[in-house]
Amino acid sequence: MVWAPLGPPRTDCLTLLHTPSKDSPKMSLEWLVAWSWSLDGLRDCIATGIQSVRDCDTTAVITVACLLVLFVWYCYHVGREQPRPYVSVNSLMQAADANGLQNGYVYCQSPECVRCTHNEGLNQKLYHNLQEYAKRYSWSGMGRIHKGIREQGRYLNSRPSIQKPEVFFLPDLPTTPYFSRDAQKHDVEVLERNFQTILCEFETLYKAFSNCSLPQGWKMNSTPSGEWFTFYLVNQGVCVPRNCRKCPRTYRLLGSLRTCIGNNVFGNACISVLSPGTVITEHYGPTNIRIRCHLGLKTPNGCELVVGGEPQCWAEGRCLLFDDSFLHAAFHEGSAEDGPRVVFMVDLWHPNVAAAERQALDFIFAPGR
């Protein structure tokens, strides 16, 4: 089909308007004929298009139409500036704010705690961080994270009470209270091979304890009974230089772990000490993207970890892996003569979080972001 102009050339129009002559009636007639020819061509084009659609197979037309509708729907949901309205982490914990309870149990009041701090507009902030990451890098592989942030309130509200991460839930991850050693075999073997190294550095640190004061670098955590101390090398993704200098070999060891979380707020590495008679009440961790690893350093009788209702005991020189987004608690019911229960705790990536997702989560949950 040959394209036809919808009107006479511009010069003819100008001549017709501004240069009256005896040929004006003839030019007007030519102009009308040209328009008539153009409309005939347009009508023929439309008729041809309609006939082409009629000649197509009805099933094929319906299929193409459905695919087009699905594509438009997908673009709408992916391209929205803001996620659907949902309950923020802050509002999930608002009811507990007045009396210091979390899921019916005491929680810490530390302003630095990513799990217990009430962060206004957290979900919107996470979505903004994800969009910023995608602009810099790619949306490829971000489906689960995008889904998790968009539907966070629904996920957290609909989770069974046995597993309810307080900050971020990544959907479609296999769930189990305890993991086998093979889940992160390399890192487990590295830690267990260096058991004596870590134990020696702990014993040097522990000599500074006295009945009258808490040694520098140690933190005392809130418990209903007993005493729970922690000595952080990495605290919520941030290295603690003063403490690392006191445990140089243990700190260097962290660098040899392949799956250690060290660049986002869900990553920690510390020595955890429970004195006899201590009870850590049931609580949930902040996320399901990590595995918490405990390497037993000193494990007297009467000590127990309960995750998702399943009890386990620590063993010296052995790693115990669990998902702390499950409801969990710890006890030291031994006597004063038994001494403290001591573990080296480090957070590892859940084995089913892909490499691209790990990079994005490090960006989204970077300390201070």
Curated annotation (Swiss-Prot):
Positions of transmembrane segments: 59-79
Gene Ontology MF: a single term: metal ion binding
Keywords annotated in UniProt: Dioxygenase, Glycoprotein, Iron, Membrane, Metal-binding, Oxidoreductase, Signal-anchor, Transmembrane, Transmembrane helix
Localization (cell): Membrane
Regions of this protein lying in the Cytoplasmic compartment: 1-58
E.C. no: 1.14.11.-
Residue sites binding Fe cation per the record: 283, 328
UniProt record similarity statement: Belongs to the aspartyl/asparaginyl beta-hydroxylase family.
Protein name listed in UniProt: Aspartate beta-hydroxylase domain-containing protein 2
Gene name per UniProt: ASPHD2
